[in-house]
Design a protein with these regions (language model features):
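Peripheral, non-catalytic segments flanking oxidoreductase cores
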Residues: 2-373
Length: 373
């Protein structure tokens, strides 16, 4: 469980890219992030025909990725009506009664498609139970506009793909829901592929270095609903009344593109151990480095711990798009991320095995916390 140490600090255990780790948290008042901590990057030049323009964005991304690991992007090319319609669809879905939502339960899916109820997860067992509700979809090549013929996908790729319909069939009572979610998903697919090239440039690689790894990507959406919770941090995690919106964690794949409404609640752990607000900024997405990218850069890029706490008194919605290499691909440290004489910190690993390892690490953390409580 979380422990209080010297005056002014506390400690939590978190499952990280390197396994369970202990982080010291300063008990300072929550504050908004500084522009130097979470910068706003105008990414419109990534669509330019000029390589120098595209490299200028890549350098800004590199600076952010080696600092806090979070940044906002503006002029990203995703129309406002797409995010507004997906937001409206999310509210329409989550405001239904629980029995109706459970018809699309994720427990009916073989690959994490569908609805997850509140109080069923503890993303960080060192904290309270998560009150978040979510609706998730995973990669389906039938809605990937870059895939021409699903029947031509190689067998070694198809073994990791599940094309399911149940989560759509069980939300068909909402006529605009499927269309709105897919529109958001497809817009983020296009943006993520463009940003993947930006990340390649940021690592002094050829712009297309990662293209082959994201032909059939690990790409999923979580539509998240956070009811308001009281700001009562005095409760210990073992208290049955302890609740968090979603506990402290890092994301698993390469990077995340997050849309959030105007309510706020996303908190990022700064490098010096302070919780800082990644407040909503209109017409932007928040992008954060995830674990696989930290791994392949030999820890040069930072997958930063974050959480959500909705203390606003209002309902909150966020829509996270999680982007990674295809599960059939390999997650390997890049040679050009090694200084002369520097050794690789990580062995090569299949991306599906990497995902399973991260889930296992979270399970191990859960066991540790149970033993210490």
């Amino acid at each position: 469980m979380a422990t209080v140490t010297q005056t002014g600090t506390t400690q939590i255990r978190v499952a990280s890219p390197t396994g369970p780790v202990t982080r010291t948290i300063l008990r300072t008042p929550l504050r908004d992030a500084l522009p130097s901590e979470i910068p706003i990057i105008d990414v419109s030049p990534i669509f330019s025909s000029s390589l120098e323009d595209r490299k200028s964005v890549a350098q800004q991304v590199r600076n952010a990725a080696t600092n806090t690991g979070f940044f906002y992007i503006k002029n990203h090319g995703v129309p406002n009506h797409v995010t507004q319609e997906s937001y409206n669809a999310a509210l329409e879905f989550f405001r239904q009664d629980v029995d109706k939502k459970n018809e699309a339960s994720i427990t009916k899916s073989a690959r994490y498609n569908g609805y997850r109820a509140p109080d069923t997860q503890r993303v960080n067992p060192d904290e309270g139970i998560d009150v978040r509700e979510s609706f998730s979809i995973t990669y389906d090549p039938r809605i990937d506009t870059e895939v021409n013929k699903v029947q031509e996908i190689p067998e070694n790729v198809m073994e990791y793909i599940r094309m399911e319909e149940g989560h759509w069939e069980n939300t068909s009572n909402l006529p605009n829901f499927k269309r709105s979610v897919i529109n958001h998903y497809q817009s983020c697919l296009s943006l993520a592929r463009a940003l993947t090239r930006t990340f390649a440039l940021s690592l002094d690689l050829p712009e297309t270095a990662f293209d082959s790894k994201v032909v059939y990507p690990d790409a999923g959406i979580n539509m998240n609903y956070y009811p308001p919770i009281p700001n009562n941090q005095s409760l210990t995690p073992t208290d049955p009344n302890a609740r968090v919106s979603i506990g402290s964690h890092t994301d698993f794949p390469v990077f995340t593109i997050l849309w959030q409404d105007n309510v706020g609640g996303l908190q990022v752990l700064s490098r010096d151990g302070q919780w800082i607000n990644a407040k909503p900024i209109p017409d932007t997405f928040v992008v954060n480095i995830a674990d696989c990218l930290q791994r392949i850069t030999n820890d040069k890029y930072v997958s930063t711990i974050h959480r959500a706490q909705n203390w606003s008194g209002k309902e909150r919605v966020s829509i996270g798009f999680f982007w990674g290499f295809g599960f059939h691909e390999t997650c390997a440290v890049l040679d050009n991320c090694l200084a002369p004489g520097e050794k690789k910190k990580y062995e090569d690993i299949n991306c599906w095995e990497w995902l399973k390892k991260r889930v296992y690490d979270m399970t191990q953390l859960d066991e540790e916390c149970k033993k210490s409580s």
